[in-house]
C-alpha cells in the first residue's frame, strides 16, 4: 500500500502545538509519510496579518527542526500575490507523480465555505480532502453538501489506493488553540509558552512580533 503525502496550508501566524500535534496525529492514524506545510502570505478568504512571511517561515523552521515528518513549500510565499489552492495543487502535481496519493488537509470550519474557493470542484482532480474537526457554524449549501456526500469515504485505507478524488473525515481531537488567540496573548502581555514550542516563543519575544494589535 502506498503511503500518502499531505499538504497542510495556513497562515501559521504563529505555528503552534495545535498545528503540530494535529499533523502528527493524522500522520500516525492514516500513515502519512510526509506533511508539506504550505504557509500562505496572502490568503484570499481571510484578513492578511502584519507578520512578514519571512518571520512566519522562520517560526515554522524552528518548530519542525529535526522532525522528518515535515517539510516546507514556498509556493504561496511571494509578497502581495493572492494564491488559490487549485493553482497550487496543479503546480505540486507537476513536481510529483500523478499516481502518488496526495491529501489536502483542511478544517471543518473551512469546509463550510469551500464552495467559495476558486474552481472548488476541481480540487479533487488533484488531491483528496482530509478534513479535521474544528468548531464551526453550520452553513447550508445544498450543492456543496451533495458534492461532499458523493465523494466521502469512511475507510482511510482507500486514500492510499488512488491518487485523488476522495473526502475523508478524521476523528482527531478538535483543536482548541488558535493563532489569533496567541497573537492577542502576546499583545496583552499574557504568557503563551504552553501553546507553542519554546523556541518559537523565544523568537516571538526576541522579535516583538505581536506587540502591535493585529
From Swiss-Prot:
Q: What's one GO BP annotation on this UniProt entry?
A: NAD biosynthetic process
Pathway info: Cofactor biosynthesis; NAD(+) biosynthesis; deamido-NAD(+) from nicotinate D-ribonucleotide: step 1/1
Enzyme Commission number: 2.7.7.18
Catalytic reactions on record: nicotinate beta-D-ribonucleotide + ATP + H(+) = deamido-NAD(+) + diphosphate
Q: Which GO terms describe its molecular function?
A: ATP binding; nicotinate-nucleotide adenylyltransferase activity
Keywords, in A-Z order? ATP-binding, NAD, Nucleotide-binding, Nucleotidyltransferase, Pyridine nucleotide biosynthesis, Transferase
Q: Name one Pfam family in it.
A: CTP_transf_like
Write out the function statement from the record.
Answer: Catalyzes the reversible adenylation of nicotinate mononucleotide (NaMN) to nicotinic acid adenine dinucleotide (NaAD).
**Family annotation (NCBIfam families):** cyt_tran_rel, nicotinate (nicotinamide) nucleotide adenylyltransferase, PRK00071.1-1
Family affiliation = Belongs to the NadD family.
Q: In its UniProt entry, what is this protein called?
A: Probable nicotinate-nucleotide adenylyltransferase
The organism is Buchnera aphidicola subsp. Acyrthosiphon pisum (strain Tuc7)
Instruction: Name the encoding gene, please.
Output: nadD
